[in-house]
């Protein structure tokens, strides 16, 4: 039977983007997420469904549907294994200003496997493998992706630090003659990230006496290299966010 501690989540979001110049790139997006967290035996299961729509100022509107399930189970006191499957369907309604949008309509499948290990109460690690395939209406957009990632987590009493590195290898299946006539695109992306989370109350006690408001700092560096130079790029980003937890029944 399903676990008694099951929970169900409904999440909606709306975002709006307006640019000072080049307003043709303005858009609004809408999203709905339904998710269930439950258990079956020693398995923790999390099926989900996500729907989204993006309305562009001039370009074709885009839609997407994604569903899947993730799960994990412990082995002993230090090990746990995770797995997941996802299905996605995305499409565009071509209009007079974007008559080829339908070419990127695609259906995708993905699987993931992961292993978490706790060295002690402070140090833990995560390893992950993934495979996905995306098949579009026009074959030049078909590709397979192979993922590998590793993460080290440090749960210090004064802060939580997470360091991760991920590799993604993308292999396209057909030649894109609009770019080159004799080479099938193949590339890889290396993403390194560093995240730090700390309670605001540790820094400014009178603003957060309960230490339930957290500051999240993150840094990410992405390097992409391909056998077609058009797709080579480097990118760096820094972000800060705040999060707070609370109980509805207290």
What are these regions (language model features)?
Residues 1-250:
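Gram-negative and organellar
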């Amino acid at each position: 039977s399903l676990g008694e501690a099951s929970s169900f989540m409904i999440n909606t979001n709306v975002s709006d983007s307006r640019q000072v110049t080049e307003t043709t790139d303005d858009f609004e997006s809408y999203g709905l997420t339904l998710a269930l967290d439950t258990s079956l035996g020693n398995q923790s299961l999390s099926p989900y469904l996500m729907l989204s729509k993006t309305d562009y100022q001039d370009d074709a509107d885009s839609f997407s549907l994604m569903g899947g399930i993730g799960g994990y189970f412990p082995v002993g006191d230090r090990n746990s294994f995770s797995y997941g499957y996802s299905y996605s369907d995305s499409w565009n309604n071509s209009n007079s200003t974007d008559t080829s949008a339908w070419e990127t309509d695609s259906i995708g499948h993905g699987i993931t496997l992961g292993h978490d290990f706790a060295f002690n109460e402070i140090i833990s690690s995560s390893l992950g493998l993934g495979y996905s395939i995306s098949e579009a209406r026009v074959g030049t957009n078909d590709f397979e992706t192979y993922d590998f990632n590793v993460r080290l987590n440090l749960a210090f009493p004064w802060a939580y630090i997470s360091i991760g590195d991920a590799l993604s290898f993308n292999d396209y299946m057909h030649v894109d003659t609009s770019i080159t006539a004799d080479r099938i695109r193949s590339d890889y992306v290396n993403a390194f990230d560093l995240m730090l989370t700390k309670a605001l109350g540790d820094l400014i006690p009178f603003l957060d006496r309960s230490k339930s408001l957290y500051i999240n700092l993150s840094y990410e560096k992405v390097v992409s290299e391909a056998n077609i130079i058009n797709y080579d790029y480097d990118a760096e980003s820094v972000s800060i966010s705040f999060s707070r937890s609370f109980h509805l029944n207290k």
